[in-house]
């Protein structure tokens, strides 16, 4: 008989079906220690372990957002969910939808964690607390419309300060919807903006009943409020995170109303006392001023009032004279300045400057003409002198006096030693030349 081999996918799918259909694996309750936990923005993946085994855990974001504490590595927890097989890796895991600390109540654990977180952020710092309005006109009350809280606040406010207007903003103060209801009402009051004080609270109850006032969203809404908030949650021994974040904490609703309002009758008494004090102070001041006035009126200055202005009149005359002289000096200086400007303007007049430049040019032309004429005459005189000297040295001038010169073979004969008997020579005279032959040579002894 041949064996049938399954694919990995087929086997995994078969096991996944078994896990899904097994009624014991559809709802499993486990206790274990958190391991490999790292907070993610979407779904959470971590492990649960004990001394002998480890199982992978997945928790969808919708379920994780409902837990009341911050999971930490090493924390022992109680979880519930269903066992599943992840086919791609072949690993089984538990997909949980609830988780709470094991050994310590989940709400107390969540409370301590959130208090620590908000304290580090500074939401409890005193410098962030807003002062209450001493004489409020409108007070917003965020609480349940039924119950002793709203009745106590109304009774106390009307007894102490009936001129204040109370406006109820009904809110759910217990259960899963309470936190969102409280946050919505806080935002609504701030958006309307015409309130001086907010009172938020509820009566006593268990930690579960009071838990909406320990939610982080409620704490941040109170911290973000632009209007001062008085928190009054539970009994005097109960301290919620809303109490820690609020600007003022009241132990009871009655105490909240007392903190929010003064006693009108006491304020009226104070006003009357202030009025009497002001009247007395004014009377004293009037009396003092009257004494001063009487003293001034009886002074010798006021008895002879002309003394008050004699010196000022003299100073005024002096100032007028100085002013007149200063004005004359100013006019004189301005006239001189004007004359100087007119002179400069006349000197720099374009037509005058053009005329002056034309005259200068004409003078330069005349000087140049005279200079050139002088140079020409001088050169003419020197030329005549040179011509006369040259004429005196001219051979024609010499021959005119009876002299002649001899050429032999085209060369001038300067010495008798250059000639020989029978040499043919040419004699040049003033008016012509003659051919001759040397017949005899006589050389004179020196």
From Swiss-Prot:
Q: What is this protein called?
A: Exodeoxyribonuclease 7 large subunit
The organism's place on the tree of life at top rank: Bacteria
- Swiss-Prot/TrEMBL catalytic activity: Exonucleolytic cleavage in either 5'- to 3'- or 3'- to 5'-direction to yield nucleoside 5'-phosphates
**What GO annotations for molecular function exist for this entry?**
exodeoxyribonuclease VII activity; nucleic acid binding
Give the UniProt record's GO annotations in the biological process aspect. Answer: DNA catabolic process
* Main localization (coarse): cytoplasm
Q: Which UniProt keywords apply?
A: Cytoplasm, Exonuclease, Hydrolase, Nuclease
Please describe the quaternary structure of this protein. Answer: Heterooligomer composed of large and small subunits.
> What EC designation does it have?
3.1.11.6
Protein's cellular compartments: Cytoplasm
Please state which protein family the record places this protein in. Belongs to the XseA family.
Q: Which GO terms describe its cellular component?
A: cytoplasm; exodeoxyribonuclease VII complex
Q: Which CDD domains match?
A: ExoVII_LU_OBF (cd04489)
Alphabetical list of InterPro entries matching this protein: Exonuc_VII_L, Exonuc_VII_lsu_C, OB-fold_nuc-bd_dom
